Amino acid sequence: MLQVNVELKERRYPITIGAGLLGDPNSYSSLKAGDKVMIVSNPTVAAHYLATVTNTLNGLGCSVDSVLIPDGEKYKTLDSLNMIFTALLEKNHNRDTTLIALGGGVIGDVAGYAAASYQRGIRFIQIPTTLLAQVDSSVGGKTAVNHPLGKNMIGAFYQPISVIIDTNTLQTLPKREVSAGLAEVIKYGAIFDIHFFEWLESNIHHLVALKQNELEYCIQRCCQLKADVVARDETEKGDRALLNLGHTFGHAIEAHLGYGNWLHGEAVSVGMLEAAELSRILGDLSAQDVSRLERLLAQAVLPTISPDGMEPSEYLPYMWRDKKVLGGQLRLVLLKSLGKAYVTAQASEQQVLSAIERFTQREFHE
């Protein structure tokens, strides 16, 4: 078992990583006999893990209820949020309740925002069951739901009291979801740590195959990198924005296709390449490093060209709605080199379009 601590100005919380944690009472040290718990999950995850978590908490003397919301990014909505509120109210939960998010990034985001909002805030625990959620979305307190006009437009910064990462949950994860998580893993190396990027180049096949030792190291390293930046910049006023490499481009893909048609990690994969190519156009990143990133993403079984039929100009309306737009300027996370990212507003719209064009479906432009 491994542990990473997220050190905030006012408090800290643990991220625990290991196999078999869901059924281990020691994983729930922040709960005690008599505590009220509401578990938020979806039918797919609940079929595998809800009984284990419920039985373990009952064994601790907790009173446990659960609510299931539909599965998928297209259900990361105010309607799903309202389902959670209704369940909490119908079961007479109050400010003493602890809400548990049992699932992937959608569950974590919606349940986290419910915890931030219900009776002005209740405690919550993240139990991420996808690789993407384990290395990224469950850590750091970003919670949100989508709006038809943009992703994550309604939300709050709200930190969990703990994160429990049971690597056994990855064994039931579809291979496509594993690859989507690896996009965020590769992102950490690209923005913060060239040595980790090089380790990934040597070990990506072990991660695709879900080898336990490599997985645990990878998850721990990603969580540590995320914890470090969250400790410096909890509410994304500075360095934390670097975690959005590829996301401005990627969110445009997701919104254009309709949420859920491409997985978030798949869209971020292409978005990172478009950001890398823009970095090359601006004179920062070498063509060789763009190719290294492209090769690593391909080895992770991720898309490396934009969706069929999506023209470069179709990105722009979504990109201009991005939360990082300030003072009428499109601010993008780019790469000085592999392992070093920065934020700039210096790229022209034509340069952005040229970068997107480089990774647009070949047959569409022939």
Swiss-Prot record:
Keywords: Amino-acid biosynthesis, Aromatic amino acid biosynthesis, Cobalt, Cytoplasm, Lyase, Metal-binding, NAD, Nucleotide-binding, Zinc. It catalyses: 7-phospho-2-dehydro-3-deoxy-D-arabino-heptonate = 3-dehydroquinate + phosphate. GO terms for molecular function: 3-dehydroquinate synthase activity; metal ion binding; nucleotide binding. Gene3D superfamilies: 3.40.50.1970, Dehydroquinate synthase-like - alpha domain. Binds 1 divalent metal cation per subunit. Can use either Co(2+) or Zn(2+). HAMAP family: DHQ_synthase (MF_00110). NCBIfam families: aroB. This is 3-dehydroquinate synthase.
